[in-house]
From Swiss-Prot:
It comes from Porphyromonas gingivalis (strain ATCC BAA-308 / W83). NCBIfam families: 16S rRNA (cytosine(1402)-N(4))-methyltransferase RsmH (TIGR00006). Pfam families: Methyltransf_5 (PF01795). PANTHER family: 12S RRNA N4-METHYLCYTIDINE METHYLTRANSFERASE (PTHR11265:SF0), S-ADENOSYL-METHYLTRANSFERASE MRAW (PTHR11265). This is Ribosomal RNA small subunit methyltransferase H. The gene is rsmH. The lineage of its organism: Bacteria, Pseudomonadati, Bacteroidota, Bacteroidia, Bacteroidales. One of its GO terms (molecular function) is rRNA (cytosine-N4-)-methyltransferase activity. Its EC number is 2.1.1.199.
Length: 311
């Protein structure tokens, strides 16, 4: 595998101790870190394994291969975690003891300006693809979607107020550009008139989150991974998931409580009661970072950690 030569900088692992405790690691067990990134969580897991233990690390971003652990107990999988079940079958694993998912976007992605993940970047291109070899980028979406589609995107994936006005402004602005809307700077200019000085960071974060989710089909991939996790874990195996925004957290919470990403409607709950979940929730309420970690690692501020055990 060829890895880029640039120095790799990834975030400090969030709630590392809580994640390890949640996995309840058996030294001889088999574990999967479906969001390998900088390898911080994976390194800590491997340190707790015996010579018989195994760890798989998933990451679709080619940059992550710079951090591969040189350890015979570790296998790196260059793939989106939505294919978890496929690869566990490929490697002949008939059941794993724990699965860890840290769903946050790494500091590395925000710092790599040419990737276009941050509204603070000087990126020449609005890309936002986690997998640089994958389909369309953010610029393509901004140029191809009509105002109605962009509005729905910003509303549902960014939970952006005045989504229609922002979408209309983008469509109007892109029509004035001969080459279409391509850069972070052009996107900022397209919405400048609608940005509130008091809510600038929040509004821009909503727009960029919505685009990133759409470009990478993040919620679709998360649903597939959560559904696959149940089949991949042994009875008594642990699922440890860290979320960073309400859309992700709602899906994880529903899966652990009801067994599906969408909660039953009120009529169904009233008539039939809650369906039997295949998960025992170890954390009834999500864990959050300690005061010390919040001070040491600001990225942990929005993290919510949920832990469950397969029944």
């Amino acid at each position: 595998m060829h890895c880029p030569d640039k120095e790799s900088v990834y975030h400090i692992p969030v709630m590392l101790g809580e994640c390890l405790e949640g996995l309840r690691i058996d030294p001889d067990g088999c574990y999967v870190d479906v969001t390998f990134g900088g390898g911080g969580h994976s390194r800590a897991i491997v340190e707790k394994l015996s010579s018989k233990g195994r760890l798989y690390g998933f990451d679709q971003d080619a940059d992550a291969c710079r951090n591969i652990l040189q350890d015979e107990r570790f296998t790196f999988v260059t793939s989106n975690f939505r294919y978890l079940a496929n690869f566990m079958d490929y490697y002949g694993e008939d059941g794993v003891d724990g699965i860890l998912a840290d769903l946050g976007v790494s500091s590395h992605h925000f710092d790599e300006e040419e990737r276009g993940f941050s509204f603070r970047s000087e990126s020449p291109l609005l890309d936002m693809r986690m997998n640089a070899r994958a389909g369309r980028n953010a610029a393509a979406i901004l140029n191809e979607y009509d105002a109605s589609s962009l509005s729905a995107l910003f509303y549902h994936y960014g939970e952006l107020k005045q989504a229609r006005r922002f979408a209309a402004s983008i469509v109007h602005y892109r029509e004035s550009l001969s080459g279409g809307l391509q850069t972070v700077g052009q996107l900022l200019e397209a919405v400048r008139g609608l940005i509130s000085p008091r809510e600038e960071k929040k509004q821009l974060a909503c727009i960029f989150q919505a685009l990133r989710i759409e470009v990478n089909d993040e919620l679709g991939a998360l649903q597939q991974m959560l559904e696959a996790a149940l089949g991949c874990l042994r009875s008594g195996g642990r699922l440890v998931v860290m979320t960073y925004h309400s859309l992700e957290d709602r899906m994880v919470k529903n899966v652990l409580r009801y067994g599906t990403v969408k909660a039953p409607d009120e009529d169904s709950l009233r008539l039939y009661g809650a369906p039997q979940s295949p998960w025992q929730q170890i954390t009834r309420k999500p864990l959050t970072a300690s005061t010390k970690e919040l001070s040491d690692n600001p990225r942990s501020r929005s993290a919510k950690l949920r832990i469950a055990e397969k029944i």
